[in-house]
Structures are given as structure tokens and as C-alpha cells.
UniProtKB/Swiss-Prot annotation:
Activation and inhibition: Allosterically activated by HslU binding.
Record's GO cellular component terms: HslUV protease complex; proteasome core complex
Name of this chain's protein: ATP-dependent protease subunit HslV
Xref: SUPFAM superfamilies: N-terminal nucleophile aminohydrolases (Ntn hydrolases)
EC nos: 3.4.25.2
Catalytic residues in the record: T12
Location, primary (coarse class): cytoplasm
One Pfam match: Proteasome
InterPro entries in alphabetical order: ATP-dep_Prtase_HsIV_su, Ntn_hydrolases_N, Proteasome_sua/b, Proteasome_suB-type
Protein residues bound to Na(+): A167, C170, T173
GO biological process, one term: proteolysis involved in protein catabolic process
Protein's organism: Chlorobium phaeobacteroides (strain BS1)
Record-linked NCBIfam families: ATP_dep_HslV, PRK05456.1
Encoding gene (name): hslV
Protein's cellular compartments: Cytoplasm
Length: 182
């Protein structure tokens, strides 16, 4: 696919899971430009707020880093209230002339909450505590839901196994997994 006459940069599958008071968020490491893999070990997740929140991104890297910085500012402004910071970021993202052009999505987990924040102004808190974004997200989400339902694996193991399953299916996802747990 092309965007603005240039090959589209595709990257990533990010998956977060909350289970038994623990949260884990992981991503693969593949970055693809058009139909070419250009990097195998891209880091797409980051810890925030004294390491109690983990965020991941899918989409344009520079845009995502800008949004992560803004999200961290919102967390500081609102005293670490995750939902409030997410809603305020989504509102700014949708209404600000500069921010609205940014093309990325964020997945955010803490031991209590899992959220997806999009540029359309959506802040989504899935009922099952599983968040997934990126090109292989639906494969990883399906695997995580199945593992949650049929195993006693912890959050980190569910994320790892689900991303490996997605990597077997999605051509834009690889098995170089980066994982953080809180």
C-alpha cells in the first residue's frame, strides 16, 4: 500500500493482557517498508509513571513517540489517573490541528486497566482486559482470548505465546518479542 505516493511503513503487533493483578504488554520487532522487512528488532513499548504503566504503539514511529510524550505529560498533569489522562490525550489528539495529523495508535496497560487510545478520539477499555493493536492484532487477540479461557498461564506468558502465534500468521509480525510486566 502507498500513502501520499510513498510506500507505507508497516510495523507491528502490540498485545497487552491483565490477569491476576499483573499486566504485561509486548510487541514484535519487525518494521516493514512496502514489501521489504527493514528492521527485525524495533522497540515499540515503553514504561511510564514510575514504571507502573506500560505503553506500546503501532503506526508511524515519530508520531507515536510524540503521542507517548504527550500522554506522559497528561499522566503528570492528572496525578497518574490513567483514564483521565487517556481521555484528555484523545480529546487533544482529535481537536488539535497539529496532533490530528499524527498516525498511530497506543495500547496502555497497568495492573488495573487496559486501554486503546486512537486518533479518532476513542479510548477503549476492553471488558476482558486484553488490548491489541497493529497489523497482527486480530491474530494475537484471538490467541490471547483462547489462552485466557483455556489455560492458567500468567499475563506475560499469554502475551508471549499470543505474539508468537501472530508471528506465524501475519507477514508484518516477527518472533523478536519485547515484553514488559507490571
Amino acid at each position: 500500500m502507498e500513502r501520499y505516493g510513498k510506500p507505507e511503513l508497516r510495523a507491528t503487533t502490540v498485545l497487552g493482557v491483565i490477569r491476576n493483578g499483573k499486566a504485561a504488554l509486548g510487541s514484535d520487532g519487525q518494521m516493514t517498508l512496502g514489501n521489504t522487512v527493514i528492521k527485525h528488532s524495533t522497540r515499540k513499548i515503553r514504561r511510564l509513571r514510575q514504571a507502573q504503566i506500560v505503553t506500546g504503539f503501532a503506526g508511524a514511529t515519530a508520531d507515536a513517540v510524540t503521542l507517548l510524550d504527550r500522554f506522559e505529560e497528561k499522566l503528570q498533569t492528572y496525578g497518574g489517573l490513567l483514564e483521565r489522562a487517556a481521555v484528555e490525550l484523545a480529546r487533544d489528539w482529535r481537536t488539535d490541528k497539529y496532533l490530528r495529523r499524527l498516525e498511530a495508535m497506543l495500547a496502555v496497560v497497568s495492573p488495573e486497566k487496559a486501554l486503546i487510545i486512537s486518533g479518532t478520539g476513542d479510548v477503549i477499555e476492553p471488558e476482558d482486559g486484553i488490548v491489541a493493536i497493529g497489523s497482527g492484532s486480530m491474530f494475537a487477540l484471538a490467541a490471547a482470548r483462547s489462552l485466557m479461557k483455556h489455560t492458567d498461564l500468567n499475563a506475560a506468558d499469554i502475551v508471549r505465546e499470543s505474539l508468537l502465534i501472530a508471528a506465524d500468521i501475519c507477514i508484518y509480525t516477527n518472533d523478536h518479542i519485547v515484553l514488559e510486566e507490571v
